Structures are given as C-alpha cells and as structure tokens.
Amino acid sequence: MYSSKRGLYCKSIFLPINNSDFLSMFIYAVAYNKLIVSDKVTGEVHMNILKKIEMYRQEEELLKWEGTFGEYLEILREKPWVAQSAHSRVYNMIKDAGIDEVNGKKEYNFFSDQLFGLEEPLERLVEEYFHPAAKRLDVRKRILLLMGPVSGGKSTLVTMLKRGLEAYTYTDKGAVYAIKGCPMHEDPLHMIPHSLRKDFYDEYGIRIEGNLSPLNLMRLQEEYGGKIEEVVVERVFFSEDKRTGIGTFSPSDPKSQDIADLTGSIDFSTIAEYGSESDPRAYRFDGELNKANRGMMEFQEMLKCDEKFLWHLLSLTQEGNFKAGRFALISADELIVAHTNETEYRSFISNKKNEALHSRIIVMPVPYNLKATEEERIYEKMIRESDVSDVHIAPHTLKIAAIFTILTRLKEPKKGDIDLVKKMRLYDGENVEGFSSADLKELQNEYGDEGMSGIDPRYVINRISSTIIRKDVTSINALDVLLSLKEGLDQHSSITNELKEKYLNCISLARKEYDEIAKKEVQKAFVYSYEESAKTLMDNYLDNVEAYCNKNKLRDPLTGEPINPDEKLMRSIEEQIGISENAKKSFREEILIRISAYARKGKRFDYNSHDRLREAIQKKLFADLKDVVKITTSTKTPDEQQLKKVNEVVARLVDEHGYNSTSANELLRYVGSLLNR
C-alpha cells in the first residue's frame, strides 16, 4: 500500500479515496499485512517497522468509537449499510475490492493474488450464493459447503474470507457496531421491540431480524432500567485470534468433544453466586456459534462431525437461532462455511439419516485449475513463500511441471480429432488451428466433473523441493523435475497401476513439449536477431507466394531483371509443416486471402498472424541452423571458433532468456543430444 494525491494502492488494486477514508483504509492495509508506505515515484521507504507499529496503534485507537444507542441511530441515518447482514458484509467486501469483466465473465480482484484459474467457480460462488444471500433471498439460509479435491484451494478460499473480513471491519464500508460488553457482539437493533420494528423500517429503511439475547435482555433491565436509548454501543473489529466475529470449529474425538464447544457452557465459577443455571450471568456465551455472530464460522471437516453437532445447524441456518442451555432460542447472524472432498460428500448424501441437512446445504464445487499458465503461477507463488526461493529454476521448468499436472486432470476428449495436448492449449486460451470457441465450449461441457481428480499442486512442489535438495545445487531444470515427478509416482501409495500408467504418459507428453521448447530456445539464441531473421524469411516467402498466386514475376534485387517465384524456397518452408505438393496451391491461396482480410480491416499481416506459417518459419530457420547447432553443442573438444560460438550463445541465454551459466550449458548439451538422435 502507498498513498498518492488521488488514492491509496492496496492489495494490487487502486481504490479511490477521500481524506476521511484514508484512516480506515490505512488500517485495512495494515490488518491485511500489506503495509508498505513508500513514495509512488521513487519507491523510497519512509518508515521503519517500529514507526509503522506505532502509527498502526495510534490509527487503530482513532478508529474506535463508543456512544449511546441514540448516537448509534444517528450513524445509521447517515450510513444505513452499517446494519447490513453477515452475508451482505461478505459480498460487499468482495465487490468493493473490484470486479473486472473479461470475455463476458466476472473476475474478482479480492481473490486474484491467491487463487489462480478458478474464475468460473468463484463467479458461481459469488453470483449464486453471496450476491442473492446479500439480498436476503432464501439461499442465505443454507450452509455453504465447498467440495473439491485435496489442495484445490478450498482452505485458501476460506482463509481469504476470514482475513478479508478482519480487514474489512477496519474500513468505513465494513464497520460493525455492537452492544458493549456483550460476549456475542450483538446487533444493537435487537433491542427495538417487535411492535416498533415496522415503524423503524419506515423511518430508516432497515429490516431487523432476531431477538435480544438472554444476557442483554437482563442487562437492559438491570443496568439501564429498560432505557434502550442509554445502552452503550461500541465499534468492534473482527479477529479470529480474539474470537470476535470469526469462529473455527474442528471435530475431534466424538466421545470427548462437548456440544459446549459450539454453544457455550455453564460458568461454574459464578453458578453459586447466581444460584440458577437459567440465569444468563451464570452462563459462558463462548461457543464458536456465539463468537462467530455477525461474521462467519468455518466448520472444518463438517461431514466427519458427530450428528449431535450438526442438528444445531438446522435451526441456525433456517431460523437464524440456536438452542443453548436453559434459555430461549439465541439469535445469531453468521455465514457458515464448511469444506469437504467428493468421497466424503457422496457418503454423506447416501445416508438417509442426513436428509434433513441436505436441503440446508448449498454445494459449491471447487475443482482443480485447468489452465497451465495459471498452474505455473500457483507454483511461482508457493516457491516465493518457501525457503528455496533463492534457487535458480531454469526458464520453462515450472511451465513443463504445470503442463504435466494439467494433463493429469483433463479427461480424454470424446471427439477423435483432438488430442489431450491440443485440448490443454485450448483450455489455456491459445489459438489452435482448426478449432473455435464453440469447440472449446463443447469440450468444457463433455464432462461435468473434469478437474475433480488428478495431481495436486502440493505433490508437484514436494517433488520440486526434493529435486533441489537431492541435486544439491543452486539450479534445476525441467528434466530434473520431470524425473523427480516420475520417481515420486512409485512412492505415491494412493495411485493405482492404471492411474500410474496414465500419469507416466502425461510425463512423456510434457517431455515432448519441453523438447520443442528447448530446441526453439536454442534456435533463438543461435540467431543473433531471431525476430528479424524470421521476419525477413516471412517477407521473402510472402513476396514469392503473392507472385505465384497472381502469376507475376519478381525483380532480381541486384540486376532488376524479372525472375520466377522461388519454388525451392517456398517448398522448403511448406514441407516443414507437412504441406504436400498437391496441397501447396490451396495453402498459398489461403495465405493470400488471409493477407487481404487483414488489409481490409486496416491490420498488417505479420509473423504472428498465422500459426502454421509461423511454425513453418521457425522450423525452417532451425533446419538451416541444425548442423551448426549439432556440431557446436556435441563436439567434445571444440575448436576456438566453436568455443567462441558456444560462449556467445550461453551469454545470450543468460542475458536475454533468464538462464544462468549452469542451466544454459545444460540446455545446450540436451538440445545437442536431441539433434544427434
């Protein structure tokens, strides 16, 4: 986060602010652990950490507020959103971080720096659950159950919601006010009698749901003499650590776990003083359902939980209240999020005893990411957060690991004209010759459960870590990782022989992809100005094709004499992509039509305008260089000229392509071995 005259940069997005918002946004950024106060132009850091801590403490103190219920109503008159429900607060938190429209689909900035390749599941989650729940539609009376494979992002998603809510309550839009001294940080509006709630709605436009808790009902009479307007209200800030507005429940041994973990328990230190278990002062309202009031509760491994714990959720989700001790039903407004895997969920719904809970649950699938580029970003993030971030990972290493992983998650296309690699490229947004967006949509609709199985990111990162430690050097490449992935399959107890065979095939496919990438990389390094060489060859080819199709002659650049189109040059390029003698005429005409179409649209046909032609140019360039590369890279005792060339190529790989000297030399040796096969 850093400030400017116009706004505040926070969480990689720009949020316009005015002076009154700066304070809360500063706290928002600090609470989100993103505080970097610096000059926008120079990047100069202005404060050391102790100064930041002091400033954070001072600003947090300034955000605190305390006043009477009457003064709270004045705040509501100015800022009616303060009284929003828990579901509404979560939705607005996501919305306020920014929403982008990409190809007709919504992408939420709130999730963008932690969850990759899950745009569709996240859009479904927000638009089919959070948005209607924020509008008080019936979906808010459901437990949100995230279902997906291991390491698919379920826990990360829930953690983001929890951390985000903590930070959001420091902002003006996310402010939460509660009755002071209430262990459940209860909504002050619960004090308004039911008979006056319609009048309150007419005046403020705010609906009130829920009843005053037994403890606050007693306090209202005994401490304030029934005078609602004098009850003290305070601003509260959600914190999982302080058990304010965010709760987490994790099942343990059914024999030892007590329902009090959810709903609170009798306070044995005060029971003698107050003399009755039905006296709310002799009860500890410190269960997870109590503490998560106004915010959210994470129910870990919900489907493994003992049934007696789940029944409390029936009333809470449907009616907004739960039973605790010898009291009337206690109102609670909270989002309940649970997560599970597909196997546990199938087992749960097959049990007839759980039918009552089925209708109280809305299941949101969270599959694995199916885009190789996004998978690569996941690995980059995980490595950045590890202790091996200083190890040099050669270019394309993580990309090849990602390709392998995605191939294990994809299902074989039902149509015979497309293979798994082409399907992966289509999913990744690449243009694949002969396939359209309609074909992509058809592929995506073939299987409803695609992405619910395959290799998980943690396995890949574990194998990369193993490679780094075993190799005991500060550099690894794609071949090292593929070998480690292959070896790891033998140690993976849950992989059947059938799956192992499939995964080994995926490693072979990923290896072929790497072979092509490696050859192109070396090719670019050998040609000093690769793009210029490719452009020159392309222009030469297009001039000849145009002359051929129009039955014209070309001019010799030296003598100026008319000459026939260079058939040898054209065929040497076309043969690289399998264009036969019979097909050459139609291919050339198709190129000319494409050039005309570009010209009509005011565009220039260039090296990147035709996938197959680009591939042909690349292969032709490499074919011309093949012998040079082969001799240079495979000679055990290179002469002075060859050595100079190798050093030049290594330097170019290091300076322009992101290699270090070790990985550059390994790449050259590998490509040399490929060409000598």
Residue locations for each model-derived region?
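Short, Lys/Arg-enriched N-terminal segments with co-localized hydrophobic residues
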Residues: 21-22, 27-46
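Conserved ASCE/P-loop NTPase catalytic core
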Residues: 76, 80-677
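Long, basic/Gly/Ser/Thr-rich N-terminal segments
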Residues: 46-80
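Short hydrophobic targeting helices and cationic amphipathic motifs
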Residues: 3, 15, 20-23
